[in-house]
Amino acid sequence: FIGMIPGLIGGLISAIK
């Protein structure tokens, strides 16, 4: 779960950009 958080954040940033 902990390692999953950075992936979600990175995905959101990539989606926004």
UniProtKB/Swiss-Prot annotation:
One cellular component (GO) term of this entry: extracellular region
Subcellular locations according to the entry: Secreted
Signal peptide: none
Domain of life the protein comes from: Eukaryota
Keyword Secreted in record: yes
Any GO BP: defense response to fungus
Keyword Secreted: yes
Modified residues (Lysine amide): 17
Tissue-specificity statement: Expressed by the venom gland.
Keywords on record: Amidation, Antibiotic, Antimicrobial, Fungicide, Immunity, Innate immunity, Secreted
Role, per record: Antimicrobial peptide. Is able to kill Mycobacterium abscessus subsp. massiliense in a dose-dependent manner. Has antifungal activity against Candida spp. and one Cryptococcus neoformans strains with MICs values ranging from 12.5 to 100 uM. Shows low cytotoxic activity and low hemolytic activity on human erythrocytes. Shows anti-inflammatory activities, since it decreases release of pro-inflammatory cytokines, and increases release of anti-inflammatory cytokines. Acts by blocking the Toll-like receptor 4 (TLR4).
Note: Negative results: does not show antifungal activity against Candida glabrata (ATCC90030) (MIC>400 uM).
Family under the similarity heading: Belongs to the non-disulfide-bridged peptide (NDBP) superfamily. Short antimicrobial peptide (group 4) family.
Entry protein name: Antimicrobial peptide ToAP3
Organism: Tityus obscurus (Amazonian scorpion)
